[in-house]
Amino acid sequence: MAFFNRIFGSKTASSDKNSQITHSDNPKVKYLRQLFSQAKFRRENKCFVTEGVHLLQTAIDAQRLPEKIFVPQSLLDNAEVLGCLKSCANIQPIVLSDKIAQSISSFKTGFSIIAVFRLPENKVLPYCQDCVILDNVQDAGNVGTILRSTAACGIKNVLLNKTCADAFSSKV
C-alpha cells in the first residue's frame, strides 16, 4: 500500500491530468509491469490488474471500481473505453503512449485499457455456502477454467491453497 501511494499519490493527482506516459523508465510503468508478472508483488501491494474493456465493464457492473485506469492514447476516443471512463468519473485516467501500452500488454496482438484493483479481502465463509476447493492446481490456465466453470454454475466461493497458481495472474 505504501508503495502504491508513493508511486501514484492521491487518487486525483493533478500531475496525471493531460499528460502522457511515454518512457518505460516511468515508475508507474515499472509498477504495472510488476503487477502483471509477479504474484508476490501483487500480494505485497494488495493489487491486481485487468486488461480489456470487457473485464473492466464486468467489474463496474459488479460495483467494483478500480484504483487507477491506464488508457492507451489511441483508445481515448473509443466508445467502449469512454463508457468505462464515464462509469469511473471520479478516477482520473492515466494516458499511455501506444508504444508503452504495447510493451506492457499481456495481449499477443494489440493492447487495451488497463485497470488496477485492490485485491479482495480474505473472509471466513459461512458453513452453509457452496464452494470449490483447489489444491495444488499449478497451471494458471486450469485455475482460470475452473473459476469460469464455478461462476457458470452459480458458485461464488472458490478457495485456493498456497500451492495453486495465482488467481490474479493475467494468464487466468
Language model segments and positions:
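Boundary-proximal intrinsically disordered activation/regulatory segments immediately upstream
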Residues: 2-75, 165
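Glycine/charged-rich beta-loop-alpha catalytic/anionic-binding loops adjacent to active sites
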Residues: 39, 95-96, 127-132
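Structural motif
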Residues: 49, 70, 114-116, 132-133, ...
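Residue-level signal for inorganic ion chemistry
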Residues: 52, 115, 150
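RNA substrate-binding interface of SAM-dependent RNA methyltransferases
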Residues: 61, 121-172
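Short, aromatic/basic amphipathic alpha-helical patches
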Residues: 78-89, 172
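Glycine/small-residue-rich loop that forms an oxyanion/phosphate-binding "nest" at active or ligand-binding sites
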Residues: 93-109, 113
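Short, structured interface segments
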Residues: 112-122
